[in-house]
């Protein structure tokens, strides 16, 4: 397929950034207000996690003993997580929340979202407000909220982190995509450490300075690095992602004694 340059599909509405799309080869990408890629889909393999940050955001699977019953996504984008979860975690229910109706419309029309029903629902709402309705009944929260220029402020404030912690089940995990080059990055980390009582891990993505930051409702039962390596073997085979690379990234970026993490 010939390369198609970024083009505007929907004009900005109600203060939201305009939504655009581009295609290069078999990769279709979503943009918000600029040519920066926010989400991508492989047209031949729609469930593939094309962007490195989206793969890093699956690193939480290393630390869970039971597959999640429910996952909340704040920021639908092009539906990368929705497609992957529908394919690889088919028994997990998903709720995807996005404030921008244009993003939702384009994702439905052009990004092969899962069937909307009991297992997958889309909510048009402010994710920071919507998460307040949950009380200890969602197992994983995936946050990927950019406005085309930077992280959405409401999604990096302490009140939002507290609401997310209140929403998580007893062994729940919060995962967010941040950019390490943001001058406020360390401030965001300190807020998260405060709310989750130090149970935070950073996993750098393979490119572009993105970091998948994970925060844990309670200490993961398995923190032994050798045992996590064995778990990485099983996960890599099951899900087609490089969990050994993820584990190495976690080990290099977080305090440990070479044998255990300290969460």
Swiss-Prot record:
Transmembrane segments: none annotated. It is an enzyme of class 2 (transferase). One of its GO terms (biological process) is polyamine biosynthetic process. This is Polyamine aminopropyltransferase. SUPFAM superfamilies: S-adenosyl-L-methionine-dependent methyltransferases. PROSITE patterns: PABS_2. It comes from Neisseria meningitidis serogroup B (strain ATCC BAA-335 / MC58). Belongs to the spermidine/spermine synthase family. Residues 1-221 form the PABS domain. Its EC number is 2.5.1.16. S-methyl-5'-thioadenosine binds at residues 98, 126-127.
């Amino acid at each position: 397929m010939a390369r198609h340059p970024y083009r505007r599909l929907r004009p900005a509405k109600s203060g939201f950034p305009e939504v655009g799309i581009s295609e290069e080869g078999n990769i279709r990408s979503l943009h918000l207000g600029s040519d920066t890629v926010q989400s991508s889909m492989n047209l031949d393999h729609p469930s593939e996690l094309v962007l490195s940050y989206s793969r890093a955001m699956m690193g939480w699977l290393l630390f869970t003993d039971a597959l999640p019953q429910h996952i909340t996504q704040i920021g639908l984008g092009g539906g990368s997580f929705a497609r992957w979860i529908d394919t690889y975690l088919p028994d997990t229910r998903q709720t995807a929340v996005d404030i921008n109706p244009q993003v939702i419309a384009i994702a439905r029309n052009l990004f092969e979202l899962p069937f909307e029903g009991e297992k997958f629902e889309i909510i048009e709402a402010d994710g920071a407000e919507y998460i307040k309705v949950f009380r200890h009944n969602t197992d994983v929260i995936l946050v990927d909220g950019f406005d085309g220029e930077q992280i959405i402020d409401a999604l990096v404030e302490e009140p939002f982190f507290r609401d997310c912690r209140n929403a998580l089940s007893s062994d729940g995990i919060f995962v967010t995509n941040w950019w390490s080059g943001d001058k406020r990055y360390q401030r965001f980390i300190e807020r998260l450490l405060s709310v989750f009582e130090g149970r935070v891990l950073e996993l750098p993505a393979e490119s572009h300075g993105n970091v998948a930051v994970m925060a844990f409702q309670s200490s993961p039962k398995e923190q032994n690095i050798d045992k996590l390596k064995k778990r990485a073997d099983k996960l890599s085979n099951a899900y087609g992602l490089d969990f050994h690379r993820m584990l190495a990234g976690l080990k290099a970026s977080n305090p440990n004694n070479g044998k255990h993490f300290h969460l």
